[in-house]
Regions:
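Fe(II)/2-oxoglutarate oxygenase catalytic core
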Residues: 2-250, 254-283
Length: 283
């Protein structure tokens, strides 16, 4: 097994591993540390079933069930811990997964919860070639790039994270459309979080739509968020995953943002995703 750090603002790759094989605890610990150090890690050429996907995911902690989707159903009744990300519909015209084929804008997963998931794991079952790429941005580097005046403003701010819409902009089942950002439903989180293990600060933004900075007028909140998001998504702090079947990607959900490109609606894309329960300290 080989650990390769990419020449990029974040990400690495693990080679010569088969997740169908028995993996000893010492190797598990090395994998977890490599993910923690590089924030996003790719493992290619994995051909595993859903049981193995859950088994591998458990390396990182307790599985966290996916959030509500617009259809209000479990896509895989035998595996409720797995979310299906897909544009495919079954013979009855019912989607077999979430998020469709459009762009999924920059976000971190489920930050509208008090305890959003710590890790995300995404496995490519079926993908169109050179489409639907996923981009990741390093929130340590985003904070580093902020001008000092913005750091002073944002350091003690709290942001409301919208729970009504998903990252594709679809209204979740049981929610109403947000009329004003300051009325947004969802958790309230610090805009800046310090990792106690390395004492480094990072931005924690969730999603841009319907976000609101507590204590500010709406126009002030909008301007501040727009300024911060400019630095959070600049190309020089990002890395892009061009998917192939059998790719498995692990990322630290609370340390990065990610987005997905749109792809041809006539193509087929099926991804299986798990996530790991977080905690109150958001680390």
């Amino acid at each position: 097994m080989e650990f390769i750090q990419h020449d990029a603002p974040l990400s690495g790759r693990i080679k010569d591993i088969n997740l169908n094989d028995f993996i000893p605890n010492q190797t598990k610990a090395k994998i977890i540390k490599f993910v923690d150090d590089n924030l996003v890690v790719l493992i290619k050429n994995q051909f595993i079933n859903d049981y193995k996907l859950k088994e591998f995911s458990n390396f990182f902690g307790e599985l966290d069930p996916p959030g509500p989707n617009p259809y209000g159903i479990n896509f895989l009744p035998e595996h409720p811990e797995i979310n299906v990300i897909s544009n495919v519909k079954n013979s009855n015209g019912i989607p077999i997964g979430n998020l469709g084929d459009g762009e999924a804008t920059w976000h971190a997963d489920m930050t509208y919860l008090k305890q959003p998931p710590k890790y995300g794991i995404l496995y490519a079952v079926e993908v169109p070639k050179n489409q639907g790429n996923t981009h990741f941005a390093n929130m340590y580097k985003a904070y580093e790039k902020l001008p000092n005046n913005l750091k002073k403003i944002i350091d003690d701010k709290i942001i409301i994270h919208d729970s009504s819409h998903n990252s594709a902009g679809m209204l979740r089942k049981g929610f109403k459309k947000v009329s004003r950002p300051d009325l947004t439903p969802g958790a309230r989180h610090p805009a800046v979080i310090t990792n106690p293990q390395n004492n480094k600060k990072r931005l924690f933004l969730g999603r841009r739509p319907n976000a609101y900075v507590l204590g500010l007028k709406i126009n002030e909140s909008e301007k501040l968020l727009n300024d911060i998001w400019y630095y959070a998504t600049t190309e020089e702090i990002t890395w892009t995953q061009n998917w192939e079947v059998g790719d498995l990607l692990i990322w630290k959900n609370l340390y990065v943002l990610h987005k997905r490109d749109a792809f041809d609606p006539n193509s087929r894309r099926i991804m299986h995703r798990t996530q790991i329960k977080g905690n109150d300290n958001l680390n």
